[in-house]
């Protein structure tokens, strides 16, 4: 065991040591591993692979070589790391779905879009791609500096003399210590055009560069959404670019469609994408898909998604975009090494760095070629003098004892150069002329003379020497012109860029869609008719309308809701999943919600408590729900009419309720013993019909009420009520232009005939026996509305709205229905159309749909007919209308035999 001498120990501060060591490690990772150089766009491992393949002669016009051999050369000479890291880098450079211009030409399995790994390196073969030669061209002309390799046995280039901006064309990605880079690939032609614009004008604005560089061009194609992310990335070096796969909608006939995905976003695993879609379907986050399969082959991507009948393909596609990587974002961080240090650069800075580097490369190459041309001209001048003085040259050589003596003698003599002075000046070789204006051979020239073949003494060879000298003089002049003129140098730079563009540029693969693409959540919601049911216990649910079946009047119905704890349904209406709704509570608060946010259930389900959906406080509960038009432009001319059980009404502007915070807002002030019965949108030219449970009704114009701006007002008296009576419904009707006499005359015509006239059948006004013109009869028939009244014992009737005369608000009303013990109290009054259907719900949860065309039209003062056959103790608690759907027609015949046509009139 060694005895440590205290004199050999140097105490250090551990914080300082960690700081220095960590920074050294961080810079090593940044400079030597993870971050590309802005000049050639390569990390050290990629640069070493290309240089090693070049040195080994593994060129594009040569045979493929085993990848294992290439990896071995790189690891042994330049990159002392694991072979898997080198091979992974080699594989990526060969993948046409990773690089816009692959730098390696691979043969064998080099992976796939499904995330399949490449075959082992012993099985695959590689060689340089043709475009890779443009990265390394002129490397043998002293264009870039070389550094010793890891053990000093070899030299490797610090950068490749790239002839095109590879950093932008192929992009790069990497994670270093404390920083990361993520540069997207671009179109070669666009990037070179931008470089040429910068060469022409170094002060060009970045936005002007964006005119030619439209945006990233990913090898997997796809669609870029909007330009804001592109502008941010190019202006600041950072940004987020939304990418979407390309999909087409194919009609299969019979109401069915299919979605065909032909392109996916960059770096998205196709197999994982298909799995994710399947997962979302299983979790019911994506609905409407009946079949999913991957039909991709060597010809391209094809993901086939077949939809169920009558499903809107655009909605399903939006759901796929939202829930999977078919739409993703590419976070741009244009970080690269500039002058050996990491820097986030904008588009102009990257292009400027590349152009500046190419200037250096072309300058170094020109200096190298100039020196080579001068060296060759120097030798040719010596040979020319020797040929002109061949006899003396031969004599000196013959007299010399050995080659060295001959060389020294040739160098010691001065030669007359009058006949070649123009050539000497032409090639600018001042080293040959002495003070006397004669020429002396240099050692290189003397050696070349001694090695000259006798055939050079012929007249033809003599002329060829002079011709070669003149050509070299032209080259030297051009090189000097390049070095002396930056304009000429930049001209060459542009010419070489354009040549690369002409040889390797391809059309843009990724398209760009302009506009804003902040996707509304409603774009993901399938438009579907829903039945919304609300219970006395505060439960709410939505059920697809297609879940219910049409029955005939008098049928027994089906179980629509499983009741617990004597909970009964208090409200039911039909709307679209996109229908906006206002929720009014017992304390006069209003909340806003879209229908699709309600819990989806089945006819037997109870739903969810509204207290779990809305931020209700304490004993607050929802008493009324008002569906609104989907198009908010229709709200401008609408008011809201409030009606309370005590007969109070209030007219407010609907726009006052357009913006409601999530915690709601005050809608109306209520007395303690009053409650909100109904809230409906209305227009100024319409009428309001208030109906009570005892069979009374009052009709008055909306315009007779002023708009009350105060949301805390309880309104004005709408109807005077008897002691035990209360308002149970409010109906909005069309305004009546006809006089009372005209209405009475019109109502004397049978309702069957009136319906025929409304349907467009011809009629003779004189045969009708009324004192009305044909035009008046036709106008009234087209404008006629019918009021449906339903009682708790299942009775109902339809009456013409013309039978309800207009009175002032505040009155006690007229008879709406003849109420008795058999009919029970009124539970619902509403306007109906001939093709409407009625949905009734009882306190036991039984539900039935009834076509209203089977309900007789009678006068106001009648008891109606049986709509619903009730069991003992059963009462109707809710009634709502359903617009006719195509599904009903298909089901009528199926259930016609099941349901007996019963009920008394």
Swiss-Prot record:
One of its GO terms (cellular component) is DNA topoisomerase type II (double strand cut, ATP-hydrolyzing) complex. Gene3D superfamilies: 3.30.1360.40, DNA gyrase/topoisomerase IV, subunit A, C-terminal (2.120.10.90), Topoisomerase II, domain 5 (3.90.199.10), Topoisomerase, domain 3 (1.10.268.10). Residues 882-905 are annotated as: Disordered. Its EC number is 5.6.2.2. CDD domains: TOP4c. One of its GO terms (biological process) is DNA topological change. GO terms for molecular function: ATP binding; DNA binding; DNA negative supercoiling activity. It holds the Pfam family DNA_gyraseA_C. It is an enzyme of class 5 (isomerase). Transmembrane segments: none annotated. Residues 35-524 form the Topo IIA-type catalytic domain. It catalyses: ATP-dependent breakage, passage and rejoining of double-stranded DNA. Disulfide bonds: none annotated. A motif (GyrA-box) lies at residues 551-557. Keywords: ATP-binding, Cytoplasm, DNA-binding, Isomerase, Nucleotide-binding, Topoisomerase. Residues 885-905 have a biased composition (Acidic residues). The active site is at 123 (o-(5'-phospho-dna)-tyrosine intermediate). A type II topoisomerase that negatively supercoils closed circular double-stranded (ds) DNA in an ATP-dependent manner to modulate DNA topology and maintain chromosomes in an underwound state. Negative supercoiling favors strand separation, and DNA replication, transcription, recombination and repair, all of which involve strand separation. Also able to catalyze the interconversion of other topological isomers of dsDNA rings, including catenanes and knotted rings. Type II topoisomerases break and join 2 DNA strands simultaneously in an ATP-dependent manner. Heterotetramer, composed of two GyrA and two GyrB chains. In the heterotetramer, GyrA contains the active site tyrosine that forms a transient covalent intermediate with DNA, while GyrB binds cofactors and catalyzes ATP hydrolysis. Belongs to the type II topoisomerase GyrA/ParC subunit family. This is DNA gyrase subunit A.
């Amino acid at each position: 065991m060694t005895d440590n001498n205290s004199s050999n120990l140097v105490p250090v501060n551990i914080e300082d040591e960690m700081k220095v060591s960590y920074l050294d490690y961080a810079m090593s990772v940044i400079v030597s591993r993870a971050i590309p150089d802005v000049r050639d766009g390569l990390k050290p491992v990629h640069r070493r692979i290309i240089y090693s393949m070049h040195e080994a002669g593994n060129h594009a016009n040569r045979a493929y070589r085993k990848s294992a051999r290439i990896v071995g050369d790189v690891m042994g000479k330049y990159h002392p790391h694991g072979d898997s890291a080198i091979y992974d880098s080699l594989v990526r450079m060969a993948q046409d779905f990773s690089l816009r211009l692959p730098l390696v030409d691979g043969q064998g399995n080099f992976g796939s879009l499904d995330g399949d790994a490449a075959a082992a390196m012993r099985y695959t073969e590689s060689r340089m791609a043709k475009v890779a030669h443009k990265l390394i061209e002129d490397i043998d002309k002293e264009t870039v500096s070389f550094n010793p390799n890891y053990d000093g046995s070899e030299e490797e280039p610090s950068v490749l003399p790239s002839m095109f901006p590879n950093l932008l064309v192929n992009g790069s990605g990497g994670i270093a210590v404390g920083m990361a880079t993520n540069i997207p690939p671009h179109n070669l032609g666009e990037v070179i055009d931008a470089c040429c614009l910068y060469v022409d004008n170094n002060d060009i604005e970045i936005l002007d560069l964006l005119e030619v560089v439209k945006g990233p061009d990913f090898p997997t194609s796809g669609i870029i959404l909007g330009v804001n992310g592109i502008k941010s990335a190019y202006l600041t070096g950072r940004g987020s670019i939304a990418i979407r796969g390309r999909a087409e909608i194919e009609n299969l006939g019979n109401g069915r469609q299919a979605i065909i995905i032909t392109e996916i976003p960059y770096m998205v695993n196709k197999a994982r994408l298909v799995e994710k879609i399947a997962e979302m379907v299983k979790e019911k986050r994506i609905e409407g898909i009946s079949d999913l399969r991957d039909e991709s082959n060597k010809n391209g991507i094809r993901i086939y998604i077949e939809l169920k009948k009558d499903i809107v393909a655009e909605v399903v596609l939006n759901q796929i975009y939202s829930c999977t990587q078919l739409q993703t974002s590419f976070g741009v961080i244009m970080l690269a090494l500039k002058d050996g240090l990491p820097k986030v650069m904008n588009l102009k800075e990257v292009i400027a760095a590349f152009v500046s580097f190419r200037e250096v490369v072309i300058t170094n190459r020109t200096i190298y070629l100039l020196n080579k041309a001068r060296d060759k001209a120097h030798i040719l001048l010596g040979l020319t003098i020797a040929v002109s003085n061949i006899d003396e040259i031969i004599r000196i050589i013959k007299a010399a004892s050995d080659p060295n003596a001959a060389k020294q003698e040739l160098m010691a003599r001065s030669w007359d150069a009058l006949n070649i002075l123009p050539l000497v000046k032409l090639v600018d070789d001042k080293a040959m002329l002495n003070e006397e204006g004669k020429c002396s051979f240099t050692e290189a020239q003397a050696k070349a003379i001694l090695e000259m073949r006798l055939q050079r003494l012929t007249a033809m060879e003599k002329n060829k020497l002079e011709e070669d000298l003149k050509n070299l003089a032209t080259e030297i002049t051009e090189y000097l012109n390049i070095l002396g003129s930056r304009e000429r140098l930049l001209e060459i730079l542009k010419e070489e860029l354009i040549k690369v563009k002409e040889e390797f540029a391809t059309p843009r693969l990724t398209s760009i869609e302009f506009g804003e693409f902040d996707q509304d959540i409603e774009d993901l919601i399938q438009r579907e008719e829903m039945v919304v049911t609300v219970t006395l216990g505060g439960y709410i649910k939505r059920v697809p309308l297609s879940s219910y079946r049409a029955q005939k009047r008098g049928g027994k119905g089906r179980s629509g809701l499983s009741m617990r704890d004597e909970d009964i349904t208090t409200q039911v209406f039909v709307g679209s999943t996109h229908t906006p709704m206002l929720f009014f509570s017992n304390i006069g608060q209003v909340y806003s919600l879209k229908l699709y946010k309600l819990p989806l259930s089945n006819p037997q389900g109870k739903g969810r408590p509204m207290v779990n959906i809305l931020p209700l406080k304490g004993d607050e509960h929802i008493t009324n729900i008002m569906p609104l038009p989907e198009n908010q432009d229709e709200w401008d001319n609408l008011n809201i009419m409030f009606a309370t059980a005590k007969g109070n009404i209030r007219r407010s502007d609907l726009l006052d309720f357009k913006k409601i915070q999530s915690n709601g807002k005050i809608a109306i002030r209520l007395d303690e013993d009053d409650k909100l019965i109904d809230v409906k949108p209305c227009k100024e030219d319409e009428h309001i019909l208030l109906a009570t449970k005892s069979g009374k009704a009052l009709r008055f114009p909306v315009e007779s009420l002023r708009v009350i701006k105060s949301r805390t007002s309880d309104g004005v008296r709408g109807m005077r009520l008897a002691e035990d009576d209360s308002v149970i419904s409010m109906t909005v009707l069309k305004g009546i232009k006809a006089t009372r006499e005209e209405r009475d005359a019109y109502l004397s015509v049978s309702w069957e005939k009136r319906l025929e006239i409304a349907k467009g059948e011809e009629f003779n006004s004189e045969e009708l026996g009324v004192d009305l013109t044909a035009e008046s009869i036709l106008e009234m028939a087209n404008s006629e509305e019918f009021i449906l009244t339903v009682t708790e014992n299942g009775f109902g009737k339809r009456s013409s709205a013309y039978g309800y005369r207009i009175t002032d608000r505040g009155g006690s009303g007229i008879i709406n229905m003849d109420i008795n013990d058999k009919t029970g109290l009124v539970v619902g009054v509403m306007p109906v159309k001939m093709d409407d259907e009625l949905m009734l719900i009882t306190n036991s949860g039984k539900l039935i749909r009834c076509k209203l065309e089977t309900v007789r039209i009678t006068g106001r003062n009648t008891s109606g007919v049986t709509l619903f056959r009730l069991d003992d103790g059963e009462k109707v608690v809710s009634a709502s209308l359903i617009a006719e759907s195509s599904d009903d027609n298909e089901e009528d015949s199926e259930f016609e035999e099941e349901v007996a046509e019963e009920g008394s009139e």
